[in-house]
Amino acid sequence: MIARHRHTGEVHALNISGWRELIYTNERVGPGVYVYEPPGNTDSWRAVGDEPCIIHITTTGRIEYLDADGNVTHHTDTHTAYAAYRDWCRAHDLQPTLSPP
């Protein structure tokens, strides 16, 4: 399950395979379906079914993870994602192949 979060920029998501359920609307999104989320959108979703859920997602801005009261608990953006990638490479004795943002 992807925890409740808010996007500060646009989101474009294309389901490649599998299904996911949007928690607040109970909408099911399947293979070949494109979803646009405007800046400020808050959502949560989970993969459903037996097939792996593979989604191509392009985001701009930050992804802010929220607690039950709507307070930001942490965030992800280009810089935090790159730092996590770099740390993973170091932990596995690999040289990063992507440049810093």
Each PLM stretch: what is its role?
Residues 44, 48-101:
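Double-stranded beta-helix
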Residues 15, 32, 55:
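Hydrophobic pocket/interface hotspot
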Residues 2-7, 24-27, 45-48:
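Short histidine-centered beta-strand/loop micro-motifs
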Residues 1, 5-21, 58-60:
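Short, conserved beta-strand element in jelly-roll/cupin
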Residues 12, 20-44:
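Short acidic-glycine-tyrosine-enriched beta hairpin
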